[in-house]
Amino acid sequence: MKALAKLKAAPGLEMTDVPLPEVGHNDLLIKIVKTAICGTDIHIWNWDEWSQKTIPVPMHVGHEYVGVVAGMGSEVQGFKIGQRVSGEGHITCGYCRNCRAGRRHLCRNTTGVGVNREGAFAEYLVIPAFNAFPIPDDISDDLASIFDPFGNAVHTALSFNLVGEDVLITGAGPIGIMAVAIAKHVGARHVVITDVNDYRLELAKKMGATRAVNVAREDLKAVMQELHMSEGFDVGLEMSGNPQAFRQMLETMNHGGKVALLGIPPSNTAIDWNQVIFKGLEIKGIYGREMFETWYKMVALIQSGLDISPIITHHFKVDEFEQGFAAMLSGQSGKVILDWR
């Protein structure tokens, strides 16, 4: 079958032929319809330090997808051939304390589709049936293909009660932009997002941001005054991994505020701990998606009227994958989708 793979320890990916994956007795074989390019795939494309330490070579990558069930193992129940599915890309052990307690997103033995094992940038993918998620008929292939990052946004944004709250989102990547729409949909008051990328800040405006602030030109505290915010933000969603953005978030949080961290700052990032301690801030790290509560919430949000479609800005046939990666690398895109049909 055709697959998009890292064939050598160097930047880029290559289209190649690989054997069809073997289907275990608890597995689903999924015929891929559409995939989306993730920021992780950009790291792999660039072959940065993290990728060099993490990605086995050769291997085909990718983990954002939608497809149809093309085969199943002898013990699989609850699925049928031709059914549309996406799937949770974190494969968990099922036996550690967190897995047995129903907290699979915290499994210490997690392996990642397209990171530690063969991925979805291929004509077919095999995953445990446990990880597959049926897609309702009223949700498009485009939206289903980005359920993985949409789930990151849902998990982060809904970590705290947002009703009537003032929310600061730092980082206008696709996940941060989707978090804007989620926060507004569930009843946040002001939703302010910061970045230095005007293209993506404009996307955030389309998704409902009260203010989209280019911090290279605008002062965040002046924006807060403009919005008559006298006490600070109630909830912070840090999506950038940028140390200065994180520091500014802590400075502008209200006392008793809550911060969710999805972005990954450098390990030597220094912050003013007085902001955390004397404000009584609550800081929560976010990883992946809750299995599978986040997935059910994604469906419910879309079916109740949440529109995240503006985040999808580019479509390419999979043979045009280099153009798709170029669009992502340019910073002038939202989500980029590759069509495998």
Curated annotation (Swiss-Prot):
The gene is tdh. Its EC number is 1.1.1.103. GO terms for cellular component: cytoplasm. Zn(2+) 1 binds at C38, H63, E64. Belongs to the zinc-containing alcohol dehydrogenase family. HAMAP family: Thr_dehydrog. It comes from Chromobacterium violaceum (strain ATCC 12472 / DSM 30191 / JCM 1249 / CCUG 213 / NBRC 12614 / NCIMB 9131 / NCTC 9757 / MK). It is an enzyme of class 1 (oxidoreductase). This is L-threonine 3-dehydrogenase. Homotetramer. GO terms for biological process: L-threonine catabolic process to glycine. The active site is at T40, H43.
